[in-house]
């Protein structure tokens, strides 16, 4: 599923961000692959992928639709967090995305960008861990 969503995103971006049959087919294949993996019946997969909110047609496919379905497929997987950071937590990409109610007050209203070093790292390798420490809201180099 993940590979198909990556393919859909690449095909869309290669076409200037415009929907096209290759991107659309990969998007639908990603949805089907994920639903099959989690045990959804063929009839329910067909019903879901036939829903007008999903079956938008090749020319109407957007990056938002691809990333939204990829997020569902990868929920609780670190790659989903990578996509959120790649797209700067955009609620244009993931409509309705907002900071959680009990957001970490140390982040001062900013999204988390990196994980903290584990205690084992700071206790066993404190010189390097403290030298390379960045606040959790500082973007990693790859997302700048």
Segments predicted by a language model, with ranges:
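Acidic/polar-rich alpha-helix caps and helix-coil junctions
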Residues: 1-144
């Amino acid at each position: 599923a993940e590979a198909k969503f990556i393919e859909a995103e690449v095909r869309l971006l290669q076409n200037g961000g415009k929907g096209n049959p290759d991107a659309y087919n990969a998007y639908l294949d990603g949805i089907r692959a994920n639903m099959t993996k989690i045990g959804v019946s063929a009839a329910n997969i067909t019903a879901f992928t036939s829903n007008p909110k999903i079956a938008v047609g090749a020319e109407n496919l957007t990056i938002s639709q691809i990333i939204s379905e990829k997020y569902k497929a990868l929920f609780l997987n670190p790659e989903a967090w990578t996509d959120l950071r790649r797209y700067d937590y955009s609620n244009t990409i993931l409509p309705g995305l907002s900071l959680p109610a009990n957001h970490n007050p140390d982040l001062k209203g900013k999204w988390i960008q990196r994980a903290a070093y584990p205690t084992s790292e700071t206790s066993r390798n404190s010189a390097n861990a403290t030298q390379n420490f960045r606040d959790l809201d500082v973007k990693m180099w790859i997302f700048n």
